[in-house]
């Protein structure tokens, strides 16, 4: 353990917080657990080999003691995470109060860089007007903690900063008692879900982030953005450049439980949350604006609103703003009632607003009147925040994307063709498919007939598109704007979706020209698909019909890039380089056809699924690939870590905006040496494929990781694998990466790198020099190495060897693990060599410190997991062993702070 890293004076408060929480947890353990468990946990905190200690102690523990020890280790990881989060916020505030300027990734610093880069106000305004940044919340099942447990953690996080402000022993004792009480509740709450989450559960979890965080964070962030820009560019106005999007309730790729009903449920929940927020803000505004016409002038349009008010109290006759607000609230709540939401309004209900824009227009009348008549401060406070909120959230709160596998779309098209007496669609070649689809897309005549009985699949798919059309009509055009084609491989995949949109009334054809209400978004996710992305899109851009469709959508084409499957296919190095090359090619292609590009990055939380710091990731994109337009998926434990707290949410969203603007306005960057990167990719790919195609590899993976137990964890509504667990390609990327995180190999994020560097540099010092230069100066290569460094710091080859002992074929496992161990040695050596350092994380003290705090408990959980997996494999029906495995999976995920 690198305990010396905690001796920095800047970390004194962190050390005190950690000690305070640990003492509370020990108080709890003394009351709730046996002395042997308490003593073991104390020994773990100073042990250099936690797993060995666990192996020694475990035979002395009964089932209850084993359970308590496992739970205690997981709780220690949780409370240390909380202490870390509080410390990050503390250091940020100290930094700001010291007036040291903005940190990297802040808008303050970005605006300074724009000015230093000679960007003038007009060019900045032009870029802002063409900027769209969206964080898209998905239901990918990587959040191992229950919402109940997360709520306990948030309560501790809110209380902990009070420790520094306690001025006497009594205050500290009261704080201690509050935290002890929460920890007791946490101890006595089940850590694991007993039942599988439903899609509706996932929807509710996603919605809960908004009142918890986003409703506060987004308006505040916009206010800060306006301030930062106006300090340097006084005439710049900040449009709605940042939004939150979602997939939860509309993503049916591999999830048979997503339906038209779940889509409708999602928007009802969205609307319920956002209208409750609006009602609360209008009520506060009503109390804030008792301005009297005896004291202020009021614009005529506000007086007109007041005249229509249902608030007829005598005391309000001289308070036109309050009366106008009552009118606005009654109309807004009238809309809520029209949408079927069961919420009341103290002023009754008036004619519903037809659109969020009407609601916005009335609020702006209040603002204009306040500014015109000397009340600017009131106009720029809560009212301005509410105006921004309505303009961002509308009546739908967040837009949802639709997503489905290309093959599922094709099956619906084939059945429509069959019943219409047309060609056997699935037997046609690609050229023929394009021809028949374009024929059917050249006119408005539908293929669907209400008098024909279609398969459940076809009815299910068309019902979702029809529901999306109704939702757009009711909640606003922005409620559903994207339909994503996963596993997109051919131009016909895009045209097939277009046909389904036409059949559902979401795409109209007039005089042969299409007009679509939804963006058609291809998702290229495998290595082969990424390499084929440009030919597919060039074929589309050459079609006059598709050109007209793009014109109806503002001449913007969104492309989604999948990080997960490409990594599983080819390893981290090859995946990263293929993605970069695909983006380079797409930039040139879009320029050639004068189409604006928006890239949607399907990244996970872990490096093996494209994760890593967002700021560096965006700046590492090829020049021209961002251009103000970017969407990024956020999922599972990442949503909790980044967005469950308003302060965290504000900073993480600010980072996305800052990086997007820097990458767009200051894109002066050199691409990496293509020949060098291709060579690195080719050799890395060769070694990675040698491993995963080894005949004994799949059995090794299934037996030496908790992959099969993860499938029973009830993390999400979607099945863990597409078919069976017999082939790597049938396994979803999330449990694939999740499992390698659990057994501490993190293999998808580095395997093949070391052999590639060694092969290329052997006898070739110029190549080593070139790679070192790239490591120092090229954003793409720097980001790749930085992510790899973070993962390798969490890798523990000794612990991983314990997992290898779970194999049912020791001789075969010895060969596979030998390959992995040797590649780890090479990759670590190569990484240190290119970074020109002797230790990992030398320049990332924050992560090194964080790991040092948690590693004793994390390693202990791994030791417990190996022992419990061994027991479970011998006794498959042992419920205690399965529960312990589940608890250790939870604990390890918390200790690592990312999963999949």
Swiss-Prot record:
Name used for this protein in its record: Phosphoenolpyruvate carboxylase
Cofactor: Mg(2+)
Keyword Magnesium annotated: yes
EC number(s) given by UniProt: 4.1.1.31
Homology family: Belongs to the PEPCase type 1 family.
Species for this entry: Neisseria meningitidis serogroup C / serotype 2a (strain ATCC 700532 / DSM 15464 / FAM18)
Active-site residues from the entry: 140, 568
Summary of the function given for this chain in its UniProt record: Forms oxaloacetate, a four-carbon dicarboxylic acid source for the tricarboxylic acid cycle.
């Amino acid at each position: 353990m690198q305990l010396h890293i905690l001796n920095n004076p800047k970390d004194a408060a962190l050390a005190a917080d950690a000690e305070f929480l640990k003492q509370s947890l020990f108080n709890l353990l003394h009351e709730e657990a046996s002395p042997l468990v308490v003593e073991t946990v104390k020994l773990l905190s100073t042990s250099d080999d936690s797993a060995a200690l666990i192996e020694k102690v475990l035979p002395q523990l009964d089932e209850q003691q084993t359970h308590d020890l496992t739970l205690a280790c997981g709780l220690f990881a949780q409370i240390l995470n909380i202490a870390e989060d509080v410390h990050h916020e503390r250091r940020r505030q100290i930094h700001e109060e010291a007036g040291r300027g903005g940190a990297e990734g802040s808008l303050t610093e970005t605006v300074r860089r724009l000015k230093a880069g000679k960007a003038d106000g007009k060019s900045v305004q032009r870029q802002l007007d063409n900027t769209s940044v969206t964080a898209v919340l998905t239901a990918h099942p990587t959040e191992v903690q229950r919402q109940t447990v997360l709520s306990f953690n948030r309560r501790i996080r809110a209380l902990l900063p009070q420790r520094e402000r306690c001025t006497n022993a009594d205050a500290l004792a009261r704080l201690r008692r509050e935290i002890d009480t929460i920890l007791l509740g946490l101890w006595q709450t089940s850590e694991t879900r007993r039942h599988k989450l439903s899609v509706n559960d996932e929807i509710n979890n996603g919605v809960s982030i908004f009142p918890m965080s986003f409703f506060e964070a987004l308006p505040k962030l916009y206010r800060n953005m306006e301030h930062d820009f106006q300090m340097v560019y006084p005439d710049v106005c900040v449009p709605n450049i940042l939004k939150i999007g979602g997939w939860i309730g509309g993503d049916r790729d591999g999830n048979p439980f997503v339906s038209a009903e779940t889509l409708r449920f999602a928007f009802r929940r969205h609307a319920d949350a956002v209208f409750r927020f609006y009602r609360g803000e209008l009520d506060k505004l009503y109390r804030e604006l008792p301005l009297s016409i005896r004291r202020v002038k009021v614009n005529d349009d506000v007086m007109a609103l007041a005249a229509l008010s249902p608030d007829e109290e005598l005391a309000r006759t001289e308070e036109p703003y309050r009366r106008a607000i009552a009118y606005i609230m009654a109309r807004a709540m009238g809309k809520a009632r029209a949408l079927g939401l069961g919420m009341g309004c103290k002023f009754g209900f008036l004619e519903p607003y037809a659109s969020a824009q009407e609601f916005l227009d009335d609020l702006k009348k209040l603002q204009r009147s306040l500014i015109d008549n000397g009340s600017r401060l009131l106009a720029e406070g809560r009212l301005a925040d509410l105006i921004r909120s309505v303009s961002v959230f509308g009546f739908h709160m967040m837009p949802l994307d639709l997503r489905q596998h290309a093959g599922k779309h094709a099956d619906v098209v084939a059945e429509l063709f069959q019943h219409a007496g047309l060609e056997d669609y699935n037997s046609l070649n690609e050229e023929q498919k394009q021809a028949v689809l374009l024929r059917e897309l050249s006119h408005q005549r539908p293929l669907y007939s209400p008098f024909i009985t279609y398969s459940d699949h076809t009815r299910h798919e068309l019902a979702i598109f029809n529901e999306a059309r109704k939702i757009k009509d009711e909640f606003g055009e922005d409620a559903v704007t994207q339909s994503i084609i996963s596993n997109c491989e051919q131009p016909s995949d895009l045209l097939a979706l277009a046909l389904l949109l036409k059949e559902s009334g979401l795409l109209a054809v007039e005089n042969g020209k299409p007009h679509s209400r939804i963006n058609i978004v291809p998702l290229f996710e495998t290595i082969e698909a990424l390499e084929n992305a440009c030919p597919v899109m060039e074929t589309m851009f050459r079609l006059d019909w598709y050109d007209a469709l793009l014109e109806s959508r503002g001449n913007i084409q969104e492309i989604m890039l999948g990080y997960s499957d490409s990594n599983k296919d080819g390893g981290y190095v090859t995946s990263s380089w293929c993605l970069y090359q695909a983006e380079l090619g797409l930039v040139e292609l879009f320029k050639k056809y004068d189409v604006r590009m928006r890239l949607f990055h399907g990244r996970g939380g872990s490096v093996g699924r494209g994760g890593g710091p967002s700021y560096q990731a965006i700046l590492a994109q090829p020049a021209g690939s961002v251009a103000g337009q970017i969407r990024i998926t956020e999922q599972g434990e990442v949503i909790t870590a980044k967005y469950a707290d308003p302060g965290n949410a504000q900073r993480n969203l600010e980072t996305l905006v800052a990086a997007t603007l820097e990458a767009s306005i200051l894109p002066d960057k050199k691409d990496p040496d293509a020949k060098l990167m291709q060579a690195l990719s080719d050799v890395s790919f060769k070694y990675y494929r040698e491993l995963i195609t080894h005949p004994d590899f799949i059995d090794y993976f299934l037996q030496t990781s908790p992959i099969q137990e993860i499938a029973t964890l009830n993390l999400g509504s979607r099945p863990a694998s597409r078919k069976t667990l017999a082939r790597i390609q049938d396994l979803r990327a999330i449990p694939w990466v999740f499992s390698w995180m659990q057994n501490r190999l993190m293999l998808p994020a580095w395997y093949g790198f070391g052999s590639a560097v060694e092969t290329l540099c052997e006898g070739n010092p110029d190549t080593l020099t070139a790679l070192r230069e790239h490591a120092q100066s090229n954003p793409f290569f720097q980001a790749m190495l930085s992510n790899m460094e973070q993962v390798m710091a969490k890798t523990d080859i000794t612990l991983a060897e314990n997992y290898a002992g779970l194999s049912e074929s020791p001789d075969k496992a010895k060969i596979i693990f030998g390959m992995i161990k040797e590649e780890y040695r090479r990759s670590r050596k190569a990484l240190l060599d290119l970074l020109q350092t002797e230790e990992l994380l030398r320049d990332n003290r924050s992560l090194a410190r964080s790991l040092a705090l948690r590693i004793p408990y994390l390693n202990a959980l791994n030791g417990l997991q190996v022992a419990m997996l061994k027991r479970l494999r011998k006794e498959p029906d042992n419920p205690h062993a399965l529960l312990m495995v589940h608890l250790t999976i939870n604990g390890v995920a918390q200790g690592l702070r990312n999963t999949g």
